[in-house]
Regions:
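Non-catalytic terminal extensions that flank enzyme cores
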Residues: 1-202
Length: 202
């Protein structure tokens, strides 16, 4: 039995990456859906949700979650979360996507369809407010502030299905490990405490 603490939120890991027949079917369906390009940060966030690294998130945050994280580092359900995980687009694209629609999420740099999402909410945000609350500055020299200020003016929220992890497993081989794989390794070694290091920037 594992001696490790439970995943964030106290439940099981929630990797959103599809596999097998479900993956093949969703890839086929995604090809015909309206497409939204993701920034590098949004693509990274999608990959993290795909492998379960952002457990227990099931998709990009709603307005109430965004507001709660900005103002008190907590989602609407009270779960601690320090930085919003959001998907943005411009006003024109936002107007053309209806709440309830399914969309394909595309890596803006490679054109690869990385996932799909059912849009449950569209909302505008105050970027300066987000920057001040999360980063305590609106200085564009701050990398986090720069990313927020350059994103679209409309956020799209909803549950996602992840179709790809961007080829990282192929590129990095055994160095690429999912949360499930690392937890299995730690358990096999009998570890109960693990020191982790997170770099300042993604």
């Amino acid at each position: 039995m594992s001696k490790l603490v439970r995943p964030h939120g106290g439940g099981e890991l929630k990797p959103l990456l599809l596999t097998g027949d479900a993956l093949a079917a969703e890839k086929t369906r995604a090809a015909s859906l309206p497409k939204i390009k993701m920034s590098s940060r949004e693509t990274g966030d999608l990959i993290m949700m795909g492998i379960g690294g952002f457990t227990p998130l099931e998709g990009f945050m709603t307005h109430s979650d965004w507001q709660g994280v900005c103002d008190g580092y907590k989602m609407a359900n009270g779960l601690f979360w320090p930085i919003p995980v959001t998907l943005s687009t411009d006003e024109v694209a936002g107007q053309n996507i209806a709440v309830g629609a399914d969309i394909a999420l595309v890596n803006g740099e490679t054109g690869e369809i990385m996932g799909t999402m059912k849009v449950t909410e569209k909302y505008a945000i105050d970027k300066a407010h987000e920057c001040m609350q999360v980063y305590k500055t609106t200085d564009l020299e701050h990398p986090g502030v720069k990313l927020v200020m350059e994103q679209g003016d409309v956020n799209l929220a909803g549950p996602i299905r992840v179709l790809s992890t961007g080829g990282f497993a192929d590129r990095y081989g055994a160095l690429f490990m999912t949360p499930a794989q690392t937890r299995a390794l730690f358990t096999s070694l009998g570890w109960s405490r693990v020191a982790a290091f997170q770099t300042r920037n993604p």
